[in-house]
Amino acid sequence: MKNHLIELKQAIYDKAYFNDEEGLELDGFQMVDTIETNAKITVEGENIKSLNEVNFYRKQQRLALRNCGVINPENIDEYIAFDGYKALEKVLTSMSQDDVIKEITDSGLRGRGGAGFPTGKKWMFTKMAEGDQKYVVCNADEGDPGAFMDRSILEGDPHNIVEAMMIAGYAIGADKGYIYVRAEYPIAVRRFQKAIDQAREYGILGQNIWGTGFNFDLEIRLGAGAFVCGEETAL
């Protein structure tokens, strides 16, 4: 008999005991049969209906990770059902490049790296830079020990990254994007490639997207895993 903490549909069950482990493969937490038929759950303590009723969680809201663990990351229809690609549609049909950059600047959005450089300024500088061909480069490599913030989104919500890179491409005038991922993240690579393939199939990536005249496509580049490989000039 083991003590478990279970989270299911925004409800937390503490001191839950699996009294009958027959039919459950615990090695690697792989379920080979349903809990309903092979386990009995006993809940002790005060009944709390949802996480929203817990003071610690009440005012917390997931942003970057909002879909992780909620939708099937390999199903574009589920992403669309959760308002996926609506922001891209709004950008392409009703906003100018400057409008998008102003929105990002006003939001105060910053990079997730240690420098915390304002994203709006980076997009503005790139838009103003001279050049016939521009690119969006997403550095999804992380070399710090135990770091997995980029991998978490790539594995749990890859279409979110596709949409974000497309919005960035529209804002700066780029029609091509590259995402740099270390080869040691096979699940992230596989799921992101599947997201790219699905977006192409749905006409979200490619030429003249939704009849707006905007062209954009994505490509994955695998890295060797060294931290220095993610430095801007090396990348």
What does each model-identified segment do?
Residues M1-L235:
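Feature of Fe-S/electron-transfer and energy-metabolism proteins
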